[in-house]
Amino acid sequence: MTKIFKLISLLYLIINSMSIAIADENFFNKGLKLFKDKKYEDARFMFERGIVFNPKDSNSYLYLAKIYNIQEDQDKEEKNLEATLLIEPSNEEAILMSMKIALERSNYSKVKDLSNTFSKVCKKLCDENKEILDTLSNIEPQKNDS
């Protein structure tokens, strides 16, 4: 009798964990579709629900950062980018977005540090780094002149 109970319990746990994994992926996919349809509040809700099921989903944090970027909430954008980079330190988009925030805030040393990291991990967006460094080189001499 106890063997049957253990078997049923094990089967229940396996099925339950599979449904949680599927639900997490489903929330992200729904959120991504809503994001592409420019329904940002609904997408934000889906990404947040996905994070509840899987707090280590770096893509959900990244898309939350993109939503907050669109909504011009830089503090929340930065927090979500930090979470993304904490989970996935080599995420190109998150590093690039963080560089742009640091550039806006005139935090040139952070831009340079992020640029060094970006240079090591970039695969798709390498040209963006060059543009930011060009912008940085145009700004820094002006800072020294004044």
Please identify what each model-predicted range represents.
Residues 53, 87, 120-124:
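Structural marker of alpha-solenoid helical repeat scaffolds
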Residues 112-146:
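Terminal, low-structured helical/coil segments at or just beyond the last alpha-helical repeat
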Residues 63, 97-98, 131-135:
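Canonical tetratricopeptide repeat
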Residues 49-50, 83-84, 117-118:
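Canonical positions in the second alpha-helix
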Residues 36-37, 70-71, 104-105, 138-142:
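Register position in tetratricopeptide repeats
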Residues 57, 91, 125-126:
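Residue-level recognition of tetratricopeptide repeat
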